[in-house]
Protein backbone atom coordinates (compact mmCIF):
# COMPACT_ATOMS: atom_id res chain seq x y z
CA UNK A 1 0.00 0.00 0.00
CA UNK A 2 2.86 2.34 0.82
CA UNK A 3 4.47 1.63 -2.58
CA UNK A 4 1.25 2.53 -4.41
CA UNK A 5 0.95 5.78 -2.47
CA UNK A 6 4.58 6.70 -3.24
CA UNK A 7 4.05 5.90 -6.93
CA UNK A 8 0.95 8.13 -7.03
CA UNK A 9 2.79 11.01 -5.35
CA UNK A 10 5.74 10.60 -7.74
CA UNK A 11 3.37 10.65 -10.74
CA UNK A 12 1.63 13.82 -9.55
CA UNK A 13 4.94 15.57 -8.94
CA UNK A 14 6.27 14.53 -12.35
CA UNK A 15 3.22 15.95 -14.14
CA UNK A 16 3.35 19.14 -12.04
CA UNK A 17 7.04 19.73 -12.77
CA UNK A 18 7.16 18.67 -16.43
CA UNK A 19 3.70 19.84 -17.41
CA UNK A 20 1.67 18.56 -20.30
CA UNK A 21 3.10 19.12 -23.78
CA UNK A 22 1.03 21.04 -26.28
CA UNK A 23 0.03 19.45 -29.56
CA UNK A 24 1.07 21.93 -32.27
CA UNK A 25 -0.17 19.62 -35.01
CA UNK A 26 -3.81 20.60 -34.56
CA UNK A 27 -3.96 23.94 -36.34
CA UNK A 28 -7.49 24.92 -37.37
CA UNK A 29 -7.99 25.52 -41.07
CA UNK A 30 -10.71 27.09 -43.20
CA UNK A 31 -12.43 24.43 -45.36
CA UNK A 32 -13.59 26.53 -48.34
CA UNK A 33 -14.67 26.06 -51.92
CA UNK A 34 -12.08 26.80 -54.62
CA UNK A 35 -12.83 28.82 -57.80
CA UNK A 36 -13.03 25.59 -59.85
CA UNK A 37 -15.90 24.26 -57.68
CA UNK A 38 -13.85 21.75 -55.67
CA UNK A 39 -13.17 22.15 -51.96
CA UNK A 40 -9.69 22.87 -50.65
CA UNK A 41 -7.45 19.95 -49.72
CA UNK A 42 -7.04 19.18 -46.02
CA UNK A 43 -3.56 18.69 -44.51
CA UNK A 44 -1.82 15.42 -45.51
CA UNK A 45 -3.80 15.15 -48.76
CA UNK A 46 -1.89 15.03 -52.04
CA UNK A 47 -1.73 18.33 -53.93
CA UNK A 48 -0.19 19.97 -56.98
CA UNK A 49 -0.07 23.63 -55.92
CA UNK A 50 -0.33 25.55 -52.65
CA UNK A 51 -3.57 27.21 -53.84
CA UNK A 52 -5.32 23.83 -53.52
CA UNK A 53 -4.51 23.54 -49.79
CA UNK A 54 -6.87 24.80 -47.06
CA UNK A 55 -5.68 28.03 -45.47
CA UNK A 56 -5.40 28.36 -41.67
CA UNK A 57 -7.76 30.67 -39.78
CA UNK A 58 -4.79 32.43 -38.16
CA UNK A 59 -2.85 33.62 -41.21
CA UNK A 60 -0.56 35.83 -39.10
CA UNK A 61 1.05 32.93 -37.22
CA UNK A 62 0.45 30.07 -39.69
CA UNK A 63 0.65 29.40 -43.41
CA UNK A 64 -0.39 26.65 -45.83
CA UNK A 65 1.99 24.95 -48.24
CA UNK A 66 2.21 22.06 -50.68
CA UNK A 67 5.46 20.18 -50.09
CA UNK A 68 7.25 16.91 -50.76
CA UNK A 69 6.76 13.94 -48.41
CA UNK A 70 7.29 10.19 -48.41
CA UNK A 71 3.98 8.30 -48.79
CA UNK A 72 3.11 5.20 -46.80
CA UNK A 73 4.38 2.84 -49.52
CA UNK A 74 7.73 4.76 -49.60
CA UNK A 75 8.16 4.19 -53.34
CA UNK A 76 8.59 7.84 -54.35
CA UNK A 77 8.00 11.28 -52.85
CA UNK A 78 4.67 13.01 -53.42
CA UNK A 79 3.34 16.53 -52.77
CA UNK A 80 1.09 16.90 -49.71
CA UNK A 81 -0.67 19.85 -48.09
CA UNK A 82 0.73 21.19 -44.82
CA UNK A 83 -0.16 23.95 -42.38
CA UNK A 84 2.95 25.34 -40.73
CA UNK A 85 3.65 27.60 -37.75
CA UNK A 86 5.73 30.68 -38.69
CA UNK A 87 7.72 30.85 -35.45
CA UNK A 88 8.12 27.18 -34.51
CA UNK A 89 8.56 25.86 -38.07
CA UNK A 90 6.30 22.93 -37.19
CA UNK A 91 3.97 21.57 -39.84
CA UNK A 92 0.97 19.25 -39.57
CA UNK A 93 1.50 15.87 -41.13
Swiss-Prot record:
Q: Does the keyword Disulfide bond apply?
A: yes
- In terms of superkingdom, the source organism counts as Eukaryota
- Disulfide bond entries: 40-54, 40-81, 53-66, 84-91
Q: What is its main location?
A: secreted
Which molecular function terms from Gene Ontology are attached? ion channel regulator activity; toxin activity
Q: Where in the cell is it found?
A: Secreted
Write out the entry's keywords from A to Z: Disulfide bond, Ion channel impairing toxin, Knottin, Neurotoxin, Secreted, Signal, Toxin
One GO CC term on file? extracellular region
Pfam families the record matches: Cys_Knot_tox
Signal sequence: where? 1-18
Q: What function is annotated for this protein?
A: Probable neurotoxin with ion channel impairing activity.
The family assignment reads:
Belongs to the neurotoxin 27 (Jztx-72) family. ICK-72 subfamily.
Regarding domains, what does the record say?
The presence of a 'disulfide through disulfide knot' structurally defines this protein as a knottin.
Query: What is the name attached to this protein's record?
Result: U8-theraphotoxin-Hs1b
Its source organism is Cyriopagopus schmidti (Chinese bird spider)
Amino acid sequence: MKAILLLAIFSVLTVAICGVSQNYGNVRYNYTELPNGEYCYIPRRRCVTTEQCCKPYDTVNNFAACGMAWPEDKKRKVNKCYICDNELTLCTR
